[in-house]
Amino acid sequence: MSEEEAHKTVEVDDVGVQLDEGDEEDLLEYDDELVEEQPSDARIRNVAETLMKSELPKVTVEYKDTTFLLFTSDDKNESNNPIICENAALYQRPMGEFMESIRKFMGNRFGRLAFATKELVLQLKSLDLTLFEDNVYNNHISFSDVYTIFKILKERSESNFETDIPTHLAIELSTRPRFVSRYNALVELTESSATLKNIKPFSNDETHPLIVDDNDQYTHQNTSEVIVMDIDDDVGEDSED
């Protein structure tokens, strides 16, 4: 086979096909059109994000007499409510990432110090379910899994013409002392002259700052070694379980 003949031969499914001059021109034109029509990665991502946002459910979050939207909603009545999770991908991400996004939003709005030693608690009364931020199983499920349960049960209730069916999933957000924060506060008591009578509710916010009396500190050292836990390390280990 001459060089000219080899140049006009292409392989289709490992089979060589001889092209004449007209076929070669058509093939080149087809390749150019294919390149022009092929969408870019950015366009694909934009389309995917648009589709995802259009499928996001309406979920409201109540905190301190304020109503937030968990995700973007097409409901015009809710258009003025702040949106907690602007990133639609969080709907299907592990619960740990989802919770971290809520913490970041609330911290920016109400001050990070208000949540520094607190664990987020999400109460879903319609499902009699409570989600805790530090739960070791958070990385095994997503919020999408939780909402799917609500959706299936709601649709069955509607089919059975039940009453008092919620129009959407509502969440009540609250906080509670983190175990590791309370534990470390108790460790501090063992390093002073404190007794059980000194056990008081732990607080470390702007309204009730934690005050340590230097004169009372270390007057009666406990000879036993007590381990102090780090919040970040504790959460990280839970995420890996």
From Swiss-Prot:
UniProt keyword list: Cytoplasm, Meiosis, Nucleus, Ubl conjugation
Post-translational modification: Sumoylated.
BP GO terms, sorted: meiotic gene conversion; reciprocal meiotic recombination
Regions crossing the membrane: none
InterPro entries: UPF0646
Cell compartments where the protein resides: Cytoplasm; Nucleus
Family the UniProt entry places it in: Belongs to the RMR1 family.
Function: Required for normal levels of gene conversion events during meiosis.
Name of this chain's protein: Reduced meiotic recombination protein 1
Organism, scientific name: Saccharomyces cerevisiae (strain ATCC 204508 / S288c) (Baker's yeast)
